[in-house]
UniProtKB/Swiss-Prot annotation:
Chlorophyll b 1 binds at Y57. This is Chlorophyll a-b binding protein 37, chloroplastic. It comes from Petunia sp. (Petunia). Belongs to the light-harvesting chlorophyll a/b-binding (LHC) protein family. The gene is CAB37. Chlorophyll a 5 binds at K212, Q230. InterPro entries: Chloro_AB-bd_pln, Chloroa_b-bind. Chlorophyll a 3 binds at Q136, L146, E213. It is a multi-pass membrane protein. The modification Phosphothreonine is found at T40. GO terms for molecular function: chlorophyll binding; metal ion binding. The LHC complex consists of chlorophyll a-b binding proteins.
Length: 265
């Protein structure tokens, strides 16, 4: 809920602005020359992941790709059967949404498995399973970060929600507002204060990192979907499900659960 509120508030009022990515295609600059934009293909001309000869979604068996999918952006495998990328402004918005959701999913997937791993290795948690952890805030003792009351001690769901919306909404609004952008970058890859390690300094390496980010992010989104299904079907976290599968692969696998699953039981 809080994440949806952040995303909605961050994009509110942006419809009056032209998509920065579309401006990259048309004029190559944004904000009256304040920040010069950089085309992805030009930033890494030797990369195999961009341009006409990039890998396609079905390899050599791929049909003719749509004319608007030119391999300019990372993660473009030439697949758009629904025509979602046909309109440049819609494509620019969906591209931004995908990258942001990829980043949330990668953080979320890590947050789902890491507490369970620590718990299995002797670290004390009030509740290590990701979909059960939040309910600890309603317990008498509240929710302690990492099980330590000397760290963050939460007892109000409203306070947690407000803090998340205010703090994360501020950061996301700062990013969407475009300032200050790193040189040659845009609001999806703002650089500057958002790139303290200087990963965007080398254009070719940066172009490769964009591809790695989108590929890992898409896997993370599927992983999160799998974690949700596991929680509904087995009532266990991903690490515990993995342990069960390794212990008895025949009895604990997707097919066995799918054929025996009864909703509500």
């Amino acid at each position: 809920m809080a994440t949806s509120a952040i995303q909605q508030s961050a994009f509110a009022g942006q419809t009056a602005l032209k998509s920065q990515n579309e401006l990259v295609r048309k004029i190559g600059s944004f904000g009256g020359g304040r920040a010069t934009m950089r085309r992805t293909v030009k930033s890494a001309p030797q990369s195999i992941w961009y341009g006409e000869d990039r890998p396609k979604y079905l390899g050599p068996f791929s049909e003719q790709t749509p004319s608007y999918l030119t391999g300019e952006f990372p993660g473009d495998y030439g697949w758009d059967t629904a025509g979602l990328s046909a309109d440049p402004e819609t494509f620019a918005r969906n591209r931004e949404l995908e990258v942001i959701h990829c980043r949330w999913a990668m953080l979320g997937a890590l947050g789902c498995v890491f507490p369970e791993i620590l718990s299995k290795n002797g670290v004390t948690f009030g509740e290590a399973v990701w979909f059960k952890a939040g309910s600890q805030i309603f317990s008498e003792g509240g929710l302690d970060y990492l099980g330590n009351p000397n760290l963050i001690h939460a007892q109000s769901i409203l306070a947690i929600w407000a803090a998340q919306v205010v703090l994360m909404g501020f950061v996301e609004g700062y990013r969407v507002g475009g300032g200050p952008l790193g040189e040659g970058l845009d609001k999806i890859y703002p650089g500057g204060a958002f790139d303290p390690l200087g990963l965007a300094d080398d254009p070719e390496a940066f172009a490769e990192l964009k591809v790695k980010e989108i590929k890992n992010g898409r896997l993370a989104m599927f992983s999160m979907f799998g974690f949700f299904v596991q929680a509904i079907v087995t009532g266990k976290g991903p690490i515990e499900n993995l342990y069960d599968h390794v212990a008895d692969p025949v009895a604990n696998n997707a097919w066995a659960f799918a054929t025996n699953f009864v909703p509500g039981k």
